Every structure is written in C-alpha cells, then in structure tokens.
A protein has these predicted regions:
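A generic structural signal for short hydrophobic patches within well-formed alpha-helices
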Residues: 11, 45, 124-125
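Short active-site oxyanion
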Residues: 34-38, 72-74, 113-115
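Short, well-structured N-terminal submotif of metal-dependent ribonuclease cores
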Residues: 1-40, 53-66, 131-133
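Short amphipathic alpha-helical interaction patches enriched in hydrophobic/aromatic residues
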Residues: 12-15, 52, 72-73, 90-94
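Acidic, PIN/NYN-like endoribonuclease modules and their adjacent C-terminal/linker elements
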Residues: 1-3, 106, 110-141
Length: 141
C-alpha cells in the first residue's frame, strides 16, 4: 500500500478525544499505522507539538512526542531543496494563504511521490501539482 502523508490536524485530532475528527484520525492510524504506511515531516512534528502543548497542555505534548518515537510514523526532514520548492509554491499560488508548513508538506510529498494525505486542512484539497497542475492529492478519511 502506498504511504500516506499525515498533517498537523490529523495528529491533533488523534490527541484530542473531543476533536470532531478524532474518530476518523484514530481509525486511519489503527489501520494504516500498523502497516507502516504513515509519513510526516519534521516541520509538521514541531507544529503539532506546539499546537497540542498550547491547547491540551505540556503532558499531552510529551505523550505525543513519546508516541512519535515509535515506528508507527516515519518522519522525514525538510531539505533545502524542499524549502526552495515550498517558496516557489507560495509564490505561484498568490490567491491562497498556504502556510509555510503546508508549502513544505506539498514539496516533501512531491519529492517522495506521495499522492495521499490524512489532512483536515482544506489546502490539501486545493493544491495542484504536475506540469500543468493537473494532479491533486487524494485525501484519506
């Protein structure tokens, strides 16, 4: 099975049982996480830690950090080439408010040839890539 990129919103939903997307995130993690199909970036890891710490407290953030040390999710580092590509993405989509994390995620997904994302961020539905922007990520829920 192809790998799935996991975005911040999915990690947060998994950590917060009160989140409206908790059950969806939990289901995907249970099925695909055991198969070793989940991938994220170091930028998403840090953004998620900060979000969980701000909303759920330091204890929950440490719990998330510990869980990320397992083999359930593979974390890839954003490279300088990814950063250059991310900047090009931000420039070529002036009508969209893609965050730095979104742009680096898109660049990393393209580099790793990942077509699927577990994301609740609408930007993953909007972004198109390929020679004529004919390709879209498939959102897994």
């Amino acid at each position: 099975m192809p790998a799935i990129f996991v975005d911040t919103g999915a990690f947060y939903a998994l950590a917060d049982i009160g989140d409206r997307n908790h059950s969806v995130a939990k289901s995907v993690f249970e099925v695909r996480g055991m198969a070793g199909d989940l991938v994220t970036s170091d930028y998403v890891f840090v953004e998620t830690w900060c979000l969980i710490r701000a909303r759920l407290g330091r204890g929950a953030a440490i719990q998330y950090w510990d869980a990320m040390q397992s083999d359930v999710v593979t974390t890839h580092g954003v490279t300088t080439k990814d950063l250059s590509q991310a900047r090009a993405i931000a420039s070529s989509w002036p009508d969209q408010d893609f965050s730095l994390i979104d742009c680096t995620s898109f660049a990393l997904m393209e580099r790793l040839r990942l077509d699927e994302a577990l994301a609740f961020d609408n930007h993953f539905r909007i972004y198109r890539y390929g020679l004529r922007r004919e390709r879209a990520f498939r959102i897994v829920h």
